[in-house]
Amino acid sequence: MYIKMATLANGQADNASLSTNGLGSSPGSAGHMNGLSHSPGNPSTIPMKDHDAIKLFIGQIPRNLDEKDLKPLFEEFGKIYELTVLKDRFTGMHKGCAFLTYCERESALKAQSALHEQKTLPGMNRPIQVKPADSESRGGSSCLRQPPSQDRKLFVGMLNKQQSEDDVRRLFEAFGNIEECTILRGPDGNSKGCAFVKYSSHAEAQAAINALHGSQTMPGASSSLVVKFADTDKERTMRRMQQMAGQMGMFNPMAIPFGAYGAYAQALMQQQAALMASVAQGGYLNPMAAFAAAQMQQMAALNMNGLAAAPMTPTSGGSTPPGITAPAVPSIPSPIGVNGFTGLPPQANGQPAAEAVFANGIHPYPAQSPTAADPLQQAYAGVQQYAGPAAYPAAYGQISQAFPQPPPMIPQQQREGPEGCNLFIYHLPQEFGDAELMQMFLPFGFVSFDNPASAQTAIQAMNGFQIGMKRLKVQLKRPKDANRPY
């Protein structure tokens, strides 16, 4: 006796037969699970999967391939239960990865063994990734899967540059089965003195580290052998970003609030040296030049700690002797110009505060647009305007004439790239301006790109990058018809 019933698979109904004498299925059925059989003649039959089937994550796939293009690649390992390409929920753009579930567990293991890091798809720089999804790795079947590559891949440094791959293999094969051994070489083909060694298990890699790290010094090497786990791709990307941030004075989180002060102090010290060298050529030290140099030194020292320095006040005025000329004094770009800095009140003795910036012969740019001011303007927003050279016309007159006034800057209208190429960035420090933003995203083209591929590359590298106590959030700007730009 057979009872007609409906079963659900992925939310769709399908007719099945259940035998009353146990678990039965009709001959030639496509598959069975818990006694449910499917009629092969029904074109709408939903395939069934094993109860212990593995959900695979597929990475490094071209963004122009969808499910129907990927299906032939994976079908050779078994019947596919579900294949889904991941897309951005706002833009619908391909993320370059997918989830795959086979009907049978063995098919997933075969596909992982045959494809993971073994084949590079057209248009990609790295081999395809086929591994259990995160949800699967937390299950109880992890013992049947291969350990992640980063848990068993070693970096070996301080090798003899004359050693070959075979020499390195002989050194490491005593600790386990070696799957890969690659010596890093330069464009000329010569060894760089380092290599990557991949074992078949994490325990073997750990044993090699314990036995060989620092154990000997190879001939021609400057220090003992280095054996450690290789960095992951994410760690390498983060290190590159931190190096780039360090060049901009942002490596230390505490340096961010005072980055503008540090740049100001550094430029002051550089100009102090140039000023002193210039006046030294004349054999006579102008009292005002000496005062300006000392004042710059004081401000630079205090500003290195993020503090605003009170300028020293000269005890007497002075004029420049006829034999002293000023054209040799170089100028400092706009970060040292007044640019809207406001500043210190008059001194107690009644004399106005001398201006360190004008010791360099640079006038404020009255025609400059406030929007074009650099981030230093925000850093010194609470300081009153200096009295400037009006207090000491004789001291500053010759230097001021040596530098013509720059033409007024015309504000430029903000430009945007085409649709799908504009990024919106959260959690930027308040001290950041256009210049800092440009430096951070310069390796990727710019914040507004001219093609979606560059925008996606920037998102992958910079999303989650930590600056100070916050992490950047980088995503595509929403379409213009959306309610919000982010």
Swiss-Prot record:
Residues 239-258 are annotated as: Necessary for TNNT2 exon 5 inclusion. Ubiquitous. Strongly expressed in the cerebellum, hippocampus, amygdala, temporal and frontal cortex and frontal lobes. Residues 18-39, 121-149 are annotated as: Disordered. GO terms for molecular function: BRE binding; mRNA binding; mRNA regulatory element binding translation repressor activity; pre-mRNA binding. InterPro entries: CELF3/4/5/6_RRM1, Nucleotide-bd_a/b_plait_sf, RBD_domain_sf, RRM_dom. Residues 54-135, 152-232, 404-479 form the RRM domain. One of its GO terms (biological process) is germ cell development. It is found in: Nucleus; Cytoplasm. RNA-binding protein implicated in the regulation of pre-mRNA alternative splicing. Mediates exon inclusion and/or exclusion in pre-mRNA that are subject to tissue-specific and developmentally regulated alternative splicing. Specifically activates exon 5 inclusion of cardiac isoforms of TNNT2 during heart remodeling at the juvenile to adult transition. Promotes exclusion of both the smooth muscle (SM) and non-muscle (NM) exons in actinin pre-mRNAs. Activates the splicing of MAPT/Tau exon 10. This is CUGBP Elav-like family member 4.
